[in-house]
Amino acid sequence: MISVNDFRTGLTIEVDGNIFTVLEFQHVKPGKGAAFVRSKLRNLRSGNTTEMTFRGGEKVNPARIESSTMQYLYASGDEYTFMNTETYEQMTFTRNQIERELRFLKENMNVQIMQYNGETIGIQLPNTVELVVTECEPGVKGDTASNVTKKATLETGFVVNVPLFVEEGERLIIDTRTEAYVSRA
């Protein structure tokens, strides 16, 4: 059992039969009443994000997630095939299972397949990926106000806000956790 006071970002826990990873947490000590921990969690099975509040000192079960490296091979209709890089065993996911990850997935990309008690619960992308801009608006000359951005479509079809100096054909580094532009590659 893990005390909620020991929460940290990235920790995986089991609550009411669901497996969650901790995205954010905040220890709150009100002037009157008992302390509590407010947390933002992602359900690893469904991908949904939820907020939960725990009483200070409450205990939760840790979830032991096993992961193995697999390479994305190809898509066939609504099915996506991955291969274990050590055993060459293949595994297929449906579009619904990995919908969020498809925004950043390229052929031959290595990902982590997460399993809990023998059940495959999803894939984990690298923290950053390198993608090519396929379409973007031209930057307006003289528009130099701070933090001005424009929309750019990447090779996977994902649309991201980028600085004005980014042009078509450039390679960008995108953070898969925040879905934001990081830098040029």
Swiss-Prot record:
Disulfide-linked positions: none
Pathway involvement of the protein, from the record: Protein biosynthesis; polypeptide chain elongation
Pfam families linked: EFP, EFP_N, Elong-fact-P_C
Subcellular location: Cytoplasm
CDD domains registered for this protein in UniProt: S1_EF-P_repeat_1, S1_EF-P_repeat_2
GO molecular function: translation elongation factor activity
SUPFAM superfamilies: Nucleic acid-binding proteins, Translation proteins SH3-like domain
Record keywords, A-Z: Cytoplasm, Elongation factor, Protein biosynthesis
PROSITE patterns attached to this UniProt entry: EFP (PS01275)
Gene Ontology CC entries for this record: cytoplasm
Predominant location category: cytoplasm
Any Gene Ontology biological process: peptide biosynthetic process
Stated family: Belongs to the elongation factor P family.
Function: Involved in peptide bond synthesis. Stimulates efficient translation and peptide-bond synthesis on native or reconstituted 70S ribosomes in vitro. Probably functions indirectly by altering the affinity of the ribosome for aminoacyl-tRNA, thus increasing their reactivity as acceptors for peptidyl transferase.
HAMAP family attached to this UniProt entry: EF_P (MF_00141)
Protein name: Elongation factor P
UniProt source species: Brevibacillus brevis (strain 47 / JCM 6285 / NBRC 100599)
